[in-house]
Regions:
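ABC transporter nucleotide-binding domains
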Residues: 2-4, 9-202
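Generic "edge-of-domain/loop-turn" microfeature
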Residues: 14-16, 28-30, 205, 229, ...
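Short, well-ordered alpha-helical microsegments
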Residues: 69, 191, 208, 256-258, ...
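Short loop/turn segments at beta->alpha junctions
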Residues: 90, 211, 272-275
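Charged/polar, solvent-exposed surface patches and flexible loops
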Residues: 100, 112-115, 168, 172, ...
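ABC transporter nucleotide-binding domain
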Residues: 166-254
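Short, charged/small-residue-rich alpha-helical element at the C-terminal edge
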Residues: 220-296
């Protein structure tokens, strides 16, 4: 389990990047970390991987602190958004380095993945395209057989075939080895296909965090036609109208919403599920965040 409890981090004495952040990734989960631009997602990830030390609060993996703890860090596979950390070495040189630094490095898996990624192991990574560098990063990181896989915008720039291949490999590790995955991405449609838990951040703190199924069961879109007032008990996040048809985005489970709407004797009442992207937009809209600034 990955846990951040009441974590605060300030840079330059003024900019508070994390503000009392609490985050929990259950063991064996695939957790999608999403949020507004500048929400603090990458800063949170750099605490989880032990790169940053928090000003206050705690950061633990498996109940143990991460910062300056090599034993815990050796169980983490991390792919950052900026792959400049890999420097100018070749894949063969980096694989040899990983083999000495990570006792869990699986040489057999590294060899097996050669047919998946098909990269020249003698070419310096700096000569690779951004997409090829991502391939190399996944090849090396998946060869670690990590207990915890932490990914920051991991498949940005990859073609659809390779994206599917990489997610398939990662999910095989979840199913076969109980790997815990945390992935930060702006591609909410893709996260919805692979994640079972979601956390939504804004301005350094967590807006909400729960399983994806619970999250989707607590928001509903309604299209209705009624001549009567709507019940005051409805938690309306957004409403619009086209002619006589009203469209409402509501917080609440579908059955409760349906029962409440029945009191207004609607002539038409259709309940529709919301996508993760829609939940994200309307949840952040409630904080005053301008929807036009969202990057999805």
């Amino acid at each position: 389990m990955i846990e951040l409890s009441h974590v605060t981090k300030t840079f330059g004495g003024a900019t508070r990047a994390l503000d009392d952040l609490t985050l929990t990734v259950p063991q064996g989960a695939v957790y999608g970390l999403v949020g507004s631009n500048g929400a603090g997602k990458t800063t949170a990830i750099r605490h989880i991987t032990g790169i940053f030390r928090q000003d206050s609060g705690s950061v633990t993996i498996g109940g143990l602190p991460v910062y300056e703890n090599p034993a815990v860090k050796s169980r983490i596979g991390y792919i950052p958004d900026d792959l400049g950390v890999f420097g100018g070495g070749t894949l063969r040189e980096l694989a040899a380095f990983y083999r000495t630094m990570y006792p869990r490095f699986d040489a057999k898996r590294y060899a097996a993945l050669r047919d998946v990624f098909r990269l020249d192991e003698a070419t310096p990574l700096r000569r690779f395209s951004k997409g090829m560098q991502k391939h190399a990063a996944f090849w090396l990181t998946l060869s670690l057989r990590p207990d915890y896989l932490v990914l920051d915008e991991p498949v940005d720039g990859l073609d659809p075939v390779m994206r599917r291949q990489i997610w398939s490999l990662a999910l095989e590790d979840v199913a076969g080895y109980g790997t815990t995955v945390l992935v930060s991405s702006h591609n909410l449609r893709e996260l919805e296909d692979i994640c079972d838990h979601v956390g939504i951040m804004h301005m350094g703190h967590m807006l909400l965090e729960r399983s994806l199924s619970d999250l989707q069961d607590n928001f509903v879109k309604v299209q209705l036609v009624t001549e009567n007032p709507l019940p005051q008990s409805l938690q309306i996040l957004h409403e619009s109208a086209l002619g006589r048809v009203q469209t409402l985005i509501l917080r609440g489970d579908p059955q409760t919403v349906a029962d409440e709407l029945a009191a207004s004797a609607p002539m038409l009442c259709d309940l529709l599920p919301l996508s993760l992207e829609e939940i994200f937009i309307y949840e952040l809209g409630g904080t005053g965040y301008d929807v036009k600034n969202l990057v999805l």
